[in-house]
Amino acid sequence: MKITGLTRRVDSLGRIVIPKELRRMLHIKEGSPLEIYMDVDETIVLKKYSQVGSLKNISQAYAQSLSKVTGATVCVADREEIIAAAGKNHKKYIGKALSKELEDIMDKRKSALYSKKDNNLIPVVKDDKADCEAQAIAAIVHDGDSAGAVILCACDEKGDTPDIAEKLVSAAAEFLAEQLG
């Protein structure tokens, strides 16, 4: 389906400029990986590439295992959306675009704990309110770049996420980063 038709020239180095409006609409940032391939009718296609998206099945299995062990909702995200989720509230996360706050955490390439008690919970996806009691978030770092994140949302009344939860999501992030190559 064609949304808009654009004509661009290829420069002497083989580069094609993608207009800023189109990059903004498609959430393509500087340094974003793109797949380039040809269709059968000799059409050149540019497609956003998700490293973590290629691990969807492994991510889903890991999220289910971690959710069973912890009793929490566990999500795995690439740079754009939640690609795998398991647990009580998994349906409200799967396939949804990430919140700006979560993107900022992934850009920092760290792991962190958040709790309702400390009043620092963040929304995981856009247009979502942080309705869990505690969160543990770890960035999936591959080749020095953030490729996604593992998010654990605990909804028990205690409202505290022990340090072990941060270690669990960090271990999951490390495992998925290793799977990327």
Question: Predicted segments — roles?
Answer:
Residues 3-4, 68-71, 132-134:
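Short, small/polar residue-rich loop motifs at catalytic or cofactor-binding pockets
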Residues 7-84:
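Intrinsically disordered, low-complexity terminal regulatory regions
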Residues 40-42, 102-118, 169-180:
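Short, solvent-exposed cationic patches
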Residues 56, 60-65, 98, 102, ...:
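Juxtadomain coupling helices with adjacent low-complexity linkers
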Residues 63-129:
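Structured interaction and signal-relay segments at domain junctions
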Residues 134-141:
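A short, aliphatic-rich beta-strand micro-motif
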Residues 144-145:
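Glycine-biased flexible loop/turn sites that connect beta-strands or occur in inter-domain linkers
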